[in-house]
């Protein structure tokens, strides 16, 4: 019976992925976020499924169906707020996970990293379409503004936008297709996650030192299963506090007003986790330039393996690069703040400066610092 774990075709795969997986003995809590993201994805799919049972993807009833879920469905409010705040947790963990990858040089696993970048784009697309579904003011105007950006694409832009809308404005057809895509994409994400793990297990995990750890591996279970459970408990605690004490903390009050194409909200802004990219988009006065900067702000992650100039993999023993990375983090926080502010004098300038520094830190300062560090170490 004990042999079934290693011989059964299906259980064998699970065994090699989560039980007998050789893992570096020194990986820190920064390596917990992968499993937490998996749990978040599971929570989102389950709560989303239950929401879909009561939601109607029609402009005339979408808003009231969400109200019905919160008021009349047993624990509907809990399912709805778990789904909404679960998305926020998902993005917090995603950004931590990416930050960990940058700090410890995990991007040298090219295949794993590139699938990860694709995953980020897919998750962002899914979250954006999910935000449109409650059909509140910010849902409608957010969808209008963001889809309209595609009209900046030369020649095919305007046609492409109308094709996505399914008409001449964001309307019933748009809502229906967004619901369809929002439902299917998490399953595509799950498949991509499996590929992500497949590539990761080809090379094995990275570790804080950035050097090969083949000589010092321990089994994943029980050492890291118990460590992941601790992270899971902390996540559940934070998420529960968010849902039960201040479920609307991260939301926008405008989304409690039903969508009205005739009145524009004073400040159109996306959910908090897109604000940094939104600030970069707004900081460029030209439409096409803004869209390109928006896409590049995420796509730039794919350049990290190319921009890696250091002879060391990890930043553990590189104080100057560490300093730059933390400046980049501060810069992203500033961009997030600016993205939520109105387009007025001080904010415009701050946003432009933060956008310039975002790209220059990644493209110029970090590679140059790495080269200087190599010189200092006589490499």
Swiss-Prot record:
InterPro entries: Cyt_b/b6_C (IPR005798), Cyt_b/b6_C_sf (IPR036150), Cyt_b/b6_N (IPR005797), Cytb/b6-like_sf (IPR027387), Cytochrome_b (IPR030689), Cytochrome_b_C_euk/bac (IPR048260), Cytochrome_b_N_euk/bac (IPR048259), Di-haem_cyt_TM (IPR016174). The chain crosses the membrane at residues 33-53, 77-98, 113-133, 178-198, 226-246, 288-308, 320-340, 347-367. Its cofactor is heme b. Binds 2 heme b groups non-covalently. A ubiquinone binds at residue 201. GO terms for molecular function: metal ion binding; ubiquinol-cytochrome-c reductase activity. It is found in: Mitochondrion inner membrane. It is a multi-pass membrane protein. One of its GO terms (biological process) is mitochondrial electron transport, ubiquinol to cytochrome c. It holds the Pfam family Cytochrom_B_C. Keywords: Electron transport, Heme, Iron, Membrane, Metal-binding, Mitochondrion, Mitochondrion inner membrane, Respiratory chain, Transmembrane, Transmembrane helix, Transport, Ubiquinone. Coiled coil: none annotated. Heme 1 (or BL or b562) is low-potential and absorbs at about 562 nm, and heme 2 (or BH or b566) is high-potential and absorbs at about 566 nm. The cytochrome bc1 complex contains 11 subunits: 3 respiratory subunits (MT-CYB, CYC1 and UQCRFS1), 2 core proteins (UQCRC1 and UQCRC2) and 6 low-molecular weight proteins (UQCRH/QCR6, UQCRB/QCR7, UQCRQ/QCR8, UQCR10/QCR9, UQCR11/QCR10 and a cleavage product of UQCRFS1). This cytochrome bc1 complex then forms a dimer. Belongs to the cytochrome b family. PANTHER family: CYTOCHROME B. Component of the ubiquinol-cytochrome c reductase complex (complex III or cytochrome b-c1 complex) that is part of the mitochondrial respiratory chain. The b-c1 complex mediates electron transfer from ubiquinol to cytochrome c. Contributes to the generation of a proton gradient across the mitochondrial membrane that is then used for ATP synthesis. This is Cytochrome b. It comes from Capromys pilorides.
């Amino acid at each position: 019976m004990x042999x079934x774990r290693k011989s059964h075709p299906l259980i064998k795969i699970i065994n090699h992925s989560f039980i007998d997986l050789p893992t570096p003995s020194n990986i820190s809590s920064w390596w917990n976020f992968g499993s937490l993201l998996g749990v978040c994805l599971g929570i989102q799919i389950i709560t989303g499924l239950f929401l879909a049972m009561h939601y109607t993807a029609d402009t005339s009833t979408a808003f009231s169906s969400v109200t019905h879920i919160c008021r009349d469905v047993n624990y509907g409010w809990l399912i709805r707020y778990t789904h909404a705040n679960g998305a926020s947790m998902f993005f917090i963990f995603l950004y931590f996970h990416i930050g960990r990858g940058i700090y410890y040089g995990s991007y040298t696993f090219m295949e794993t990293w590139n699938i990860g970048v694709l995953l980020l784009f897919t998750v962002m697309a899914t979250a954006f379409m999910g935000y449109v579904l409650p059909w509140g003011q910010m849902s409608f105007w957010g969808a209008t503004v963001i889809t309209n950006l595609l009209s900046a694409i030369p020649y095919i832009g305007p046609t492409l936008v109308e094709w996505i809308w399914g008409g001449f404005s964001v309307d019933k057809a748009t809502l229906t297709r967004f619901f369809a895509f929002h439902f299917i994409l998490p399953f595509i994400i799950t498949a991509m996650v499996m590929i992500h793990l497949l590539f990761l297990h080809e090379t094995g995990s990275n570790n804080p030192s950035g050097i090969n750890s083949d000589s010092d591996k321990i089994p994943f279970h029980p050492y890291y299963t118990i460590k992941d459970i601790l992270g899971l408990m902390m996540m559940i605690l934070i998420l529960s506090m968010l849902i039960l004490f201040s479920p609307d903390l991260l939301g926008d009050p405008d989304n409690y007003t039903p969508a009205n194409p005739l009145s524009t909200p004073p400040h159109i802004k996306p959910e908090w986790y897109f604000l940094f990219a939104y600030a970069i988009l707004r900081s460029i006065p030209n439409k096409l330039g803004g869209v390109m900067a928006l896409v590049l702000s995420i796509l730039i992650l794919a350049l990290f393996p190319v921009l890696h100039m250091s002879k060391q993999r990890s930043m553990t023993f590189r104080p100057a690069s560490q300093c730059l990375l933390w400046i980049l983090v501060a810069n992203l926080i500033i961009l997030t703040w600016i993205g939520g502010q109105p387009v007025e004098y001080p904010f415009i300038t701050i946003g432009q400066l933060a956008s310039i520094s975002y790209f220059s830190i990644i493209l110029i300062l970090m590679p140059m610092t790495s080269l200087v560090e190599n010189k200092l170490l006589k490499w």
